[in-house]
Amino acid sequence: MTEKQLSCCLDLMRRLPPSQIEDNLAGLLDLVPDLTEDLLSSIDQPLKVAYDAVSKKDYLLCDYNRDADSYRSPWSNKYDPPLSGACYPSSKLRDIEVQANEIFEIYLNLYFEGGVSSVYCWDLDDNFAAVVLMKKTQDQSKKGQPMRGTWDSIHVVEVKLGKKDKAVYKLTSTVMLSIETDNDNTGKVNLAGSLTRQDEKEYTFNEVDTHCVNIGKMVEDMESKLRQTLETIYFGKTKEVVNTLRNATGNSELEKRKNLSNQIGSAIGNRG
């Protein structure tokens, strides 16, 4: 019964507005509290931003940097609020984490012209995993354009170390995109959705540097594919549907033409 309930919950969440995912998820957790852990681990939520007072930098929150009610900053490697006996990556993995955070901060500035990024690593049995988080929020209303948008991307990479300096990188990527406009001509329009894709590749590696390069290459390629898919399929299809539904001529103009046609018909009938 539990598996069926979980399947129904996930199916329901896929059909509800992505912009209300947090409220809808909270409602589900109230209805089926026994599935709390499964639902929280299965449903991606918009990323939240926190501030690291030690490094004076923003970082992103997720389940992968949470221990109890505290979150670890990738910049200072400290938990907020402080937590005794908390989990930390091994020193070797921490080196990878530090370098990856520096790399993806540069990546975010180049591709998104700013935003917040965080990379977290954790140890597995003879292997390791990492998550790359990126968030970009744009508010054009401050510039006089009634448009706001948010891009959240979550890339989870599991690295299986093999023999002869070979490693298999399994990537699961999710992008959540939200765009909202509000003006007199169109009214309030909200487009939101999410997309998940997977990829797996084998690369050679050489300690810290190569792992960061390999993960960075996969994330960059995946984000490019996801952006293209969102633009050509999802937004392209939305535009096609809107163009099919809307009238090229306004309703008031159509009403005027209809009245004129009726008047002409009446006039012709009277002449006959």
UniProtKB/Swiss-Prot annotation:
Alphabetical keyword list: Actin capping, Actin-binding, Cytoplasm, Cytoskeleton
Gene: acpA
Localization of this protein: Cytoplasm, Cytoskeleton
Biological-process GO terms, alphabetical: actin cytoskeleton organization; barbed-end actin filament capping; cell morphogenesis; response to bacterium
Superkingdom, natural source: Eukaryota
Protein name, as recorded: F-actin-capping protein subunit beta
InterPro entries, per the entry: CapZ_alpha/beta, CapZ_alpha/beta_2, CAPZB, CAPZB_N, F-actin_capping_bsu_CS
Function: F-actin-capping proteins bind in a Ca(2+)-independent manner to the fast growing ends of actin filaments (barbed end) thereby blocking the exchange of subunits at these ends. Unlike other capping proteins (such as gelsolin and severin), these proteins do not sever actin filaments.
Gene Ontology molecular function, alphabetical: actin filament binding; lipid binding
Family that this chain belongs to: Belongs to the F-actin-capping protein beta subunit family.
Coiled coil regions in record: none
Entry's Gene Ontology cellular component terms: cortical actin cytoskeleton; cytosol; F-actin capping protein complex
Family matches, as Gene3D superfamilies: 1.20.58.570, F-actin capping protein, beta subunit (3.90.1150.210)
Pfam families named among the record's database cross-references: F_actin_cap_B
Subunit structure: Component of the F-actin capping complex, composed of a heterodimer of an alpha and a beta subunit.
